[in-house]
């Protein structure tokens, strides 16, 4: 730290700087919300133009793939195209968000990051009975559980006052790793 005591200048790390809200750029050719205005301004500054608006079927396919991992079926497409009400798109998205497929799709990212697997993933590769925790994650996404609660219950759900069974189950996250049983199993770990 000698360089500091000798008067060296340094900037505070960006992570310790409070974010400030920027006013959206003025004027718009196509933007419908503040994020669009920022994107439009940057595109114009770079001499670029946005892609043309996607067709209705492409938009439905994109949002369906994003939220459920599956394309819309023919019945869903026909129902959408036959509906002329002004909020048909919003209702389509709401149905996707209310579907169990939404939780499955969103949970995939978390399960992959947490290295979930149905086996121990080691040389003997035995079954790993972590599916109750996997199902808890799916339900957490489908019930729109707040992120702070989602992480707290996985890290320390068993330590919460009057912990419910599902909160204890959430701590399966802490056992979600490779396991080998060469030296036998320790009962307290299970």
PLM region descriptions:
Residues 2-190:
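Short, structured secondary-structure elements
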